[in-house]
Protein backbone atom coordinates (compact mmCIF):
# COMPACT_ATOMS: atom_id res chain seq x y z
CA UNK A 1 0.00 0.00 0.00
CA UNK A 2 2.82 2.38 0.87
CA UNK A 3 4.49 1.72 -2.49
CA UNK A 4 1.22 2.32 -4.37
CA UNK A 5 0.70 5.51 -2.43
CA UNK A 6 4.16 6.76 -3.35
CA UNK A 7 3.60 5.88 -7.02
CA UNK A 8 0.30 7.72 -6.95
CA UNK A 9 1.92 10.79 -5.43
CA UNK A 10 4.72 10.71 -8.00
CA UNK A 11 2.23 10.37 -10.87
CA UNK A 12 0.20 13.27 -9.53
CA UNK A 13 3.34 15.40 -9.24
CA UNK A 14 4.36 14.60 -12.83
CA UNK A 15 0.90 15.48 -14.12
CA UNK A 16 0.87 18.76 -12.20
CA UNK A 17 4.36 19.62 -13.44
CA UNK A 18 3.41 18.83 -17.05
CA UNK A 19 0.26 20.92 -16.74
CA UNK A 20 2.23 23.83 -15.30
CA UNK A 21 4.85 23.56 -18.05
CA UNK A 22 2.14 23.46 -20.73
CA UNK A 23 0.45 26.49 -19.21
CA UNK A 24 3.75 28.35 -19.05
CA UNK A 25 4.53 27.44 -22.66
CA UNK A 26 1.06 28.50 -23.72
CA UNK A 27 1.52 31.84 -22.00
CA UNK A 28 4.88 32.31 -23.76
CA UNK A 29 3.30 31.53 -27.13
CA UNK A 30 0.51 34.04 -26.50
CA UNK A 31 3.03 36.67 -25.44
CA UNK A 32 5.11 36.10 -28.58
CA UNK A 33 2.06 36.29 -30.84
CA UNK A 34 0.91 39.44 -29.06
CA UNK A 35 4.32 41.02 -29.69
CA UNK A 36 4.10 40.06 -33.37
CA UNK A 37 0.53 41.35 -33.59
CA UNK A 38 1.87 44.90 -33.67
CA UNK A 39 3.31 43.98 -37.09
CA UNK A 40 0.79 41.41 -38.37
CA UNK A 41 -2.11 43.81 -37.92
CA UNK A 42 -0.96 45.41 -41.18
CA UNK A 43 1.39 42.78 -42.61
CA UNK A 44 -1.29 40.11 -42.89
CA UNK A 45 -2.47 37.49 -45.39
CA UNK A 46 -3.60 40.18 -47.85
CA UNK A 47 0.01 41.02 -48.71
CA UNK A 48 1.39 39.74 -52.02
CA UNK A 49 4.46 38.43 -50.22
CA UNK A 50 3.51 35.53 -47.90
CA UNK A 51 4.46 37.28 -44.65
CA UNK A 52 2.56 34.94 -42.34
CA UNK A 53 4.15 31.86 -43.91
CA UNK A 54 7.01 32.38 -41.46
CA UNK A 55 4.85 30.69 -38.82
CA UNK A 56 5.35 27.46 -40.79
CA UNK A 57 9.13 27.71 -40.36
CA UNK A 58 11.49 27.19 -37.39
CA UNK A 59 11.86 30.98 -37.14
CA UNK A 60 8.13 31.30 -36.55
CA UNK A 61 7.66 28.35 -34.21
CA UNK A 62 6.16 30.17 -31.25
CA UNK A 63 6.37 27.05 -29.08
CA UNK A 64 10.16 27.35 -29.28
CA UNK A 65 11.46 30.05 -26.91
CA UNK A 66 14.51 30.50 -29.15
CA UNK A 67 12.39 31.56 -32.14
CA UNK A 68 12.73 35.28 -32.91
CA UNK A 69 9.88 37.73 -33.25
CA UNK A 70 9.42 40.24 -36.04
CA UNK A 71 11.41 42.92 -34.24
CA UNK A 72 14.21 40.52 -33.37
CA UNK A 73 15.24 40.71 -37.03
CA UNK A 74 13.74 43.98 -38.25
CA UNK A 75 14.71 45.97 -35.15
CA UNK A 76 12.43 47.99 -32.84
CA UNK A 77 11.36 50.08 -35.87
CA UNK A 78 9.61 52.71 -33.74
CA UNK A 79 9.59 55.15 -36.64
CA UNK A 80 7.86 52.59 -38.86
CA UNK A 81 5.22 51.93 -36.18
CA UNK A 82 4.31 55.61 -36.00
CA UNK A 83 4.59 56.31 -39.73
CA UNK A 84 4.08 53.54 -42.28
CA UNK A 85 6.07 55.47 -44.89
CA UNK A 86 9.16 55.20 -42.70
CA UNK A 87 11.14 52.02 -43.28
CA UNK A 88 11.76 49.44 -40.55
CA UNK A 89 15.21 49.59 -39.01
CA UNK A 90 16.35 46.61 -41.10
CA UNK A 91 14.77 45.90 -44.51
CA UNK A 92 15.50 42.48 -46.05
CA UNK A 93 13.33 42.41 -49.18
CA UNK A 94 15.52 42.42 -52.29
CA UNK A 95 12.76 44.11 -54.30
CA UNK A 96 12.47 46.98 -51.83
CA UNK A 97 13.89 50.36 -52.78
CA UNK A 98 14.76 50.80 -49.10
CA UNK A 99 16.83 47.63 -48.84
CA UNK A 100 19.27 47.81 -45.94
CA UNK A 101 22.99 47.36 -46.49
CA UNK A 102 24.25 43.80 -46.47
CA UNK A 103 26.19 44.46 -43.27
CA UNK A 104 23.01 45.44 -41.40
CA UNK A 105 21.06 42.45 -42.70
CA UNK A 106 23.86 40.04 -41.85
CA UNK A 107 24.27 41.52 -38.37
CA UNK A 108 20.61 40.73 -37.66
CA UNK A 109 21.21 37.08 -38.61
CA UNK A 110 24.55 36.76 -36.84
CA UNK A 111 22.98 38.01 -33.62
CA UNK A 112 21.66 34.45 -33.27
CA UNK A 113 23.68 32.47 -35.82
CA UNK A 114 26.99 33.40 -34.27
CA UNK A 115 30.23 31.64 -35.14
CA UNK A 116 30.72 30.94 -31.43
CA UNK A 117 27.44 29.03 -31.38
CA UNK A 118 27.84 27.50 -34.83
CA UNK A 119 31.53 26.64 -35.36
CA UNK A 120 30.88 25.72 -38.99
CA UNK A 121 30.55 29.38 -39.89
CA UNK A 122 33.61 31.33 -41.03
CA UNK A 123 31.48 34.06 -42.49
CA UNK A 124 33.49 37.15 -41.54
CA UNK A 125 36.13 37.67 -44.21
CA UNK A 126 34.76 34.96 -46.51
CA UNK A 127 34.40 35.54 -50.25
CA UNK A 128 30.65 35.93 -49.99
CA UNK A 129 30.86 38.40 -47.11
CA UNK A 130 33.62 40.38 -48.83
CA UNK A 131 31.51 40.74 -51.98
CA UNK A 132 28.51 42.15 -50.13
CA UNK A 133 26.39 39.00 -50.20
CA UNK A 134 23.74 38.92 -47.48
CA UNK A 135 22.32 35.85 -45.74
CA UNK A 136 18.95 36.67 -47.28
CA UNK A 137 20.48 36.66 -50.76
CA UNK A 138 20.25 32.87 -50.49
CA UNK A 139 17.84 32.24 -47.59
CA UNK A 140 14.17 33.22 -47.78
CA UNK A 141 13.29 33.30 -44.10
CA UNK A 142 9.53 33.68 -44.54
CA UNK A 143 9.21 30.75 -46.96
CA UNK A 144 8.28 27.37 -45.43
CA UNK A 145 10.29 25.60 -48.14
CA UNK A 146 13.71 27.16 -48.64
CA UNK A 147 15.14 26.32 -52.04
CA UNK A 148 18.72 26.59 -50.83
CA UNK A 149 18.13 23.85 -48.25
CA UNK A 150 16.56 21.40 -50.69
CA UNK A 151 18.70 18.94 -52.63
CA UNK A 152 16.44 19.31 -55.66
CA UNK A 153 16.66 23.12 -55.89
CA UNK A 154 19.86 24.24 -54.16
CA UNK A 155 21.89 24.46 -57.38
CA UNK A 156 19.42 26.89 -58.94
CA UNK A 157 19.89 29.28 -56.00
CA UNK A 158 23.67 29.18 -56.47
CA UNK A 159 23.43 29.53 -60.24
CA UNK A 160 21.49 32.78 -59.86
CA UNK A 161 24.93 34.36 -59.33
CA UNK A 162 27.33 31.69 -60.60
CA UNK A 163 26.16 31.73 -64.21
CA UNK A 164 29.37 30.33 -65.70
CA UNK A 165 28.99 27.23 -63.55
CA UNK A 166 25.36 26.92 -64.66
CA UNK A 167 26.58 26.56 -68.25
CA UNK A 168 29.42 24.20 -67.34
CA UNK A 169 27.21 21.79 -65.42
CA UNK A 170 25.15 21.18 -68.57
CA UNK A 171 28.12 19.83 -70.48
CA UNK A 172 28.52 16.21 -71.49
CA UNK A 173 30.67 15.30 -68.49
CA UNK A 174 29.51 16.83 -65.21
CA UNK A 175 28.78 16.08 -61.60
CA UNK A 176 25.19 14.88 -61.04
CA UNK A 177 23.58 18.05 -59.72
CA UNK A 178 19.88 18.82 -60.00
CA UNK A 179 19.48 21.38 -62.80
CA UNK A 180 16.25 22.68 -64.25
CA UNK A 181 15.66 21.06 -67.63
CA UNK A 182 17.83 18.04 -66.88
CA UNK A 183 15.82 15.06 -65.76
CA UNK A 184 18.41 12.97 -63.90
CA UNK A 185 17.80 12.82 -60.13
CA UNK A 186 20.33 14.80 -58.07
CA UNK A 187 23.07 12.88 -56.31
CA UNK A 188 25.05 15.94 -55.24
CA UNK A 189 24.50 19.53 -54.21
CA UNK A 190 26.85 22.50 -54.38
CA UNK A 191 27.32 22.41 -50.59
CA UNK A 192 28.83 18.91 -50.82
CA UNK A 193 32.00 20.63 -52.06
CA UNK A 194 31.52 24.27 -51.06
CA UNK A 195 30.68 25.88 -47.72
CA UNK A 196 28.82 29.10 -48.55
CA UNK A 197 29.24 30.42 -45.00
CA UNK A 198 33.02 30.51 -45.22
CA UNK A 199 35.96 28.17 -45.37
CA UNK A 200 39.63 27.93 -44.51
CA UNK A 201 40.28 26.48 -47.97
CA UNK A 202 40.20 28.03 -51.46
CA UNK A 203 36.95 28.70 -53.32
CA UNK A 204 34.90 28.15 -50.15
CA UNK A 205 35.72 24.43 -50.27
CA UNK A 206 34.54 22.29 -47.38
CA UNK A 207 38.08 20.92 -46.92
CA UNK A 208 41.41 22.69 -46.64
CA UNK A 209 42.49 21.87 -50.20
CA UNK A 210 41.12 20.87 -53.59
CA UNK A 211 42.48 17.34 -53.30
CA UNK A 212 41.05 16.71 -49.83
CA UNK A 213 37.64 17.85 -51.07
CA UNK A 214 37.80 15.50 -54.06
CA UNK A 215 39.05 12.58 -51.98
CA UNK A 216 35.93 12.78 -49.81
CA UNK A 217 34.19 10.94 -52.67
CA UNK A 218 37.08 9.70 -54.84
CA UNK A 219 38.87 7.88 -52.02
CA UNK A 220 40.49 5.37 -54.38
CA UNK A 221 42.58 8.20 -55.85
CA UNK A 222 43.95 9.31 -52.48
CA UNK A 223 46.94 7.00 -52.17
CA UNK A 224 49.58 6.98 -50.83
CA UNK A 225 51.08 5.18 -53.80
CA UNK A 226 54.45 3.58 -54.32
CA UNK A 227 54.71 5.55 -57.56
CA UNK A 228 53.18 9.03 -57.34
CA UNK A 229 52.15 11.20 -60.29
CA UNK A 230 53.26 14.71 -59.36
CA UNK A 231 50.41 16.64 -61.06
CA UNK A 232 47.91 14.49 -59.16
CA UNK A 233 49.65 15.13 -55.85
CA UNK A 234 49.76 18.86 -56.60
CA UNK A 235 46.09 19.42 -57.49
CA UNK A 236 43.26 17.56 -59.18
CA UNK A 237 42.59 20.79 -61.09
CA UNK A 238 45.77 20.29 -63.12
CA UNK A 239 43.84 17.79 -65.22
CA UNK A 240 40.17 18.12 -64.27
CA UNK A 241 37.62 20.91 -64.35
CA UNK A 242 35.12 20.24 -61.56
CA UNK A 243 31.89 21.77 -62.82
CA UNK A 244 31.67 20.29 -66.29
CA UNK A 245 33.62 19.45 -69.42
CA UNK A 246 33.10 18.47 -73.04
CA UNK A 247 35.66 15.71 -72.43
CA UNK A 248 35.15 12.45 -70.57
CA UNK A 249 35.91 12.25 -66.85
CA UNK A 250 35.77 16.03 -66.44
CA UNK A 251 39.17 16.37 -68.16
CA UNK A 252 40.28 19.87 -69.17
CA UNK A 253 41.18 18.54 -72.60
CA UNK A 254 41.45 15.04 -73.99
CA UNK A 255 44.55 12.88 -74.16
CA UNK A 256 47.13 13.06 -75.65
CA UNK A 257 46.85 16.86 -75.67
CA UNK A 258 46.36 17.01 -71.90
CA UNK A 259 49.46 14.87 -71.33
CA UNK A 260 51.49 16.99 -73.76
CA UNK A 261 51.03 20.04 -71.55
CA UNK A 262 53.75 18.50 -69.37
CA UNK A 263 55.24 15.70 -71.50
CA UNK A 264 56.28 17.82 -74.46
CA UNK A 265 59.37 15.89 -75.60
CA UNK A 266 59.90 12.70 -77.55
CA UNK A 267 58.37 9.52 -76.19
CA UNK A 268 61.00 8.12 -73.85
CA UNK A 269 61.11 4.56 -75.17
CA UNK A 270 59.84 5.21 -78.72
CA UNK A 271 57.53 2.21 -78.32
CA UNK A 272 54.16 2.29 -80.05
CA UNK A 273 55.53 5.13 -82.15
CA UNK A 274 53.59 3.99 -85.16
CA UNK A 275 56.74 3.06 -87.06
CA UNK A 276 55.26 -0.30 -88.01
CA UNK A 277 51.71 0.87 -88.67
CA UNK A 278 52.13 1.88 -92.28
CA UNK A 279 53.24 4.86 -94.29
CA UNK A 280 54.48 8.05 -92.80
CA UNK A 281 55.45 6.62 -89.41
CA UNK A 282 55.79 9.17 -86.63
CA UNK A 283 58.49 8.70 -84.01
CA UNK A 284 57.69 11.46 -81.52
CA UNK A 285 54.72 11.91 -79.28
CA UNK A 286 54.41 15.50 -80.46
CA UNK A 287 54.49 14.75 -84.17
CA UNK A 288 50.83 14.06 -84.75
CA UNK A 289 51.26 13.70 -88.48
CA UNK A 290 54.25 14.03 -90.77
CA UNK A 291 54.07 14.58 -94.49
CA UNK A 292 52.19 11.69 -96.08
CA UNK A 293 51.23 10.10 -92.78
CA UNK A 294 47.85 8.45 -93.22
CA UNK A 295 47.96 5.62 -90.70
CA UNK A 296 46.08 5.85 -87.41
CA UNK A 297 48.57 5.83 -84.59
CA UNK A 298 48.12 3.61 -81.57
CA UNK A 299 49.16 6.50 -79.35
CA UNK A 300 46.26 8.63 -80.57
CA UNK A 301 43.43 6.10 -80.84
CA UNK A 302 40.78 5.60 -78.17
CA UNK A 303 42.22 6.71 -74.81
CA UNK A 304 45.58 7.67 -76.36
CA UNK A 305 48.29 7.74 -73.67
CA UNK A 306 45.88 6.08 -71.26
CA UNK A 307 45.81 2.98 -73.44
CA UNK A 308 49.09 2.04 -71.79
CA UNK A 309 49.40 4.32 -68.76
CA UNK A 310 46.19 3.07 -67.16
CA UNK A 311 46.95 3.90 -63.51
CA UNK A 312 47.60 7.56 -64.12
CA UNK A 313 46.68 8.62 -60.56
CA UNK A 314 49.39 6.41 -59.06
CA UNK A 315 50.52 2.81 -58.83
CA UNK A 316 51.49 0.40 -56.06
CA UNK A 317 52.94 -2.19 -58.44
CA UNK A 318 56.73 -2.68 -58.05
CA UNK A 319 57.08 -2.24 -61.82
CA UNK A 320 54.55 0.60 -62.00
CA UNK A 321 56.91 3.54 -62.41
CA UNK A 322 55.34 4.32 -65.79
CA UNK A 323 51.81 3.87 -64.37
CA UNK A 324 51.27 0.97 -66.77
CA UNK A 325 50.28 -1.52 -64.05
Language-model-detected regions and their locations in the chain:
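Short sequence/structural segments immediately N-terminal
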Residues: 21-325
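N-terminal secretory signal peptides that target proteins for export/translocation
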Residues: 1-5
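Bacterial N-terminal signal peptides
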Residues: 8-19
Amino acid sequence: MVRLSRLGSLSAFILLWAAAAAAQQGAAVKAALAADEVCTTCHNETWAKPILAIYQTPHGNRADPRAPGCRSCHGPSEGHLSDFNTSPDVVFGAASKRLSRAEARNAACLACHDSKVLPRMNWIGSQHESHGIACTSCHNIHAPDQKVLSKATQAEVCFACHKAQRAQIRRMSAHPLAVTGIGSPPKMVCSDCHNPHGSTGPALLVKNSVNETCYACHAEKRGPFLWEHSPVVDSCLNCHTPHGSTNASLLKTRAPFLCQECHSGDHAAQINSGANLGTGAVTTINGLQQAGAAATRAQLAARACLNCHVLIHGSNHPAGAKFQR
